[in-house]
Amino acid sequence: MTVDLDWENLGFNYRKLPFRYISYFKDGKWDEGQLTEDATLHISEASPALHYGQEAFEGLKAYRTKDGSIQLFRPDENAKRLQRTADRLLMPEVPVDKFVDACKQVVRANEEYVPPYGTGATLYLRPLLIGVGDIIGVHPADEYIFTIFAMPVGNYFKGGLVPTNFLIQDEYDRAAPHGTGAAKVGGNY
């Protein structure tokens, strides 16, 4: 049913799993997409994702329930947020049904890596949308890659979630006007 891992001590680290999903946008449309064992993205050195940050990502989890079934947590909401981010970055939207289906394919293909119920671990999915192609000027790409890879993870923080005191400053806003503060892009992290 599952692989032999120390499920309760995974941490939040990359682990290469057997399968991931990849789809290409070219000539104004997405291809069908497919599962692949190739964990390498082959892109042009002139890709806008590398020079101008034309990339977006999501993060969502699949978990095993008490009865052994596997659930994805709100993949449609992640798909909609990726669409909003894509729109903000002048990228083509990934249709919600394509996004959700791709997530399901990745989970099914890597099912043995979905941690057992009760361990506190989950299967983390990382959807990624990047602008590729030979574009060196400051304008949107004409080709894109949408990919999803997965890995079993534990808590993001080593000690788990621990309450902490903090101060919320509401007098200043460091976000640039009309910027990417509401988008899930690498430049915000």
Regions found by a protein language model. Name each.
Residues 109, 131-132:
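Intrinsically disordered, low-complexity linker/loop segments enriched in Gly/Pro
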Residues 115:
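Basic, glycine/lysine-rich polyanion-binding surfaces/domains
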Residues 118-130:
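Extended, Lys/Arg-enriched charged tracts that mediate electrostatic binding to polyanionic substrates
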Residues 1-106, 135-189:
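Helix-start/capping segments and mature chain N-termini
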